[in-house]
């Protein structure tokens, strides 16, 4: 397994729409494993393949305290959503920035697991929010897209400054 490079805004590759996975095979499973390694290394709770410049419909999530409840979503589809909620969300592609984003309180999805088996999942709370956030990535949408243009601009400037400082270090 290896840690992949996470793309940061304003990288346009984050705006690409991911294509469905045709077949869950050893290559896809390796991508899933590398994505988990990357997510844990970056101390995230979710990661979409788009964020590591792989434009396929793959998501990995682990919202557990002990970091031992891996969830793999390949070709996820949103079946139902209900209620309203929101928390201050962060994103590995938008480092050190957070903003309140409106989300559905509960979701029901259909996806394939790491072995290609179909399943359905009903989620609420942090897991539901994380699923929606990561599914947005698969269609090229970022949490800042829910914000006003002024807030988007401020966040972009802060991330670009942070990336410049990190490049010098």
Swiss-Prot record:
InterPro entries: Peptide_deformylase (IPR023635), Peptide_deformylase_sf (IPR036821). It catalyses: N-terminal N-formyl-L-methionyl-[peptide] + H2O = N-terminal L-methionyl-[peptide] + formate. Binds 1 Fe(2+) ion. The active site is at 134. SUPFAM superfamilies: Peptide deformylase (SSF56420). Keywords: Hydrolase, Iron, Metal-binding, Protein biosynthesis. Its cofactor is Fe(2+). One of its GO terms (molecular function) is metal ion binding. Pfam families: Pep_deformylase. The keyword Protein biosynthesis applies. The keyword Protein biosynthesis applies. Fe cation binds at residues 91, 133, 137. Disulfide bonds: none annotated. Its EC number is 3.5.1.88. GO terms for biological process: co-translational protein modification; translation. Belongs to the polypeptide deformylase family. Removes the formyl group from the N-terminal Met of newly synthesized proteins. Requires at least a dipeptide for an efficient rate of reaction. N-terminal L-methionine is a prerequisite for activity but the enzyme has broad specificity at other positions. NCBIfam families: pept_deformyl (TIGR00079), PRK00150.1-3 (NF001159). This is Peptide deformylase. It comes from Salmonella typhimurium (strain LT2 / SGSC1412 / ATCC 700720). The lineage of its organism: Bacteria, Pseudomonadati, Pseudomonadota, Gammaproteobacteria, Enterobacterales.
